[in-house]
Amino acid sequence: MIDKQQVISDNAAGANDTGSTAVQVALLTARINNLAGHLQTNKKDKAGQRGLQLMNGQRRRLLKYLERTDYDAYIALTDKLGIRRGQRIVR
């Protein structure tokens, strides 16, 4: 089970920060880790596998946005959550 308030307080920039990109990525990461553990024991849960793919895609889009808008926060968040970073695309 995910302790949502704990994840939010660990990644929030301020007291009322519940929807910033960093918080959203942290919550998605917690949900992804929880679902991945479930899928280890329930290998035939196809709906769960699809949900995992959708959450990974959403997290990837949010991380791409964060990388584009605030690169330092992106580096700090990926290090903190243990998420691998892709190569930086300079445009």
UniProtKB/Swiss-Prot annotation:
It comes from the Bacteria. One of its GO terms (cellular component) is cytosolic small ribosomal subunit. SMART domains: Ribosomal_S15. SUPFAM superfamilies: S15/NS1 RNA-binding domain (SSF47060). Transmembrane segments: none annotated. Keywords: Ribonucleoprotein, Ribosomal protein, RNA-binding, rRNA-binding. Coiled coil: none annotated. Pfam families: Ribosomal_S15 (PF00312). GO terms for biological process: translation. GO terms for molecular function: rRNA binding; structural constituent of ribosome. Signal peptide: none annotated. One of the primary rRNA binding proteins, it binds directly to 16S rRNA where it helps nucleate assembly of the platform of the 30S subunit by binding and bridging several RNA helices of the 16S rRNA. Forms an intersubunit bridge (bridge B4) with the 23S rRNA of the 50S subunit in the ribosome. HAMAP family: Ribosomal_uS15_B (MF_01343_B). Part of the 30S ribosomal subunit. Forms a bridge to the 50S subunit in the 70S ribosome, contacting the 23S rRNA. Belongs to the universal ribosomal protein uS15 family. This is Small ribosomal subunit protein uS15. It comes from Deinococcus radiodurans (strain ATCC 13939 / DSM 20539 / JCM 16871 / CCUG 27074 / LMG 4051 / NBRC 15346 / NCIMB 9279 / VKM B-1422 / R1). The gene is rpsO.
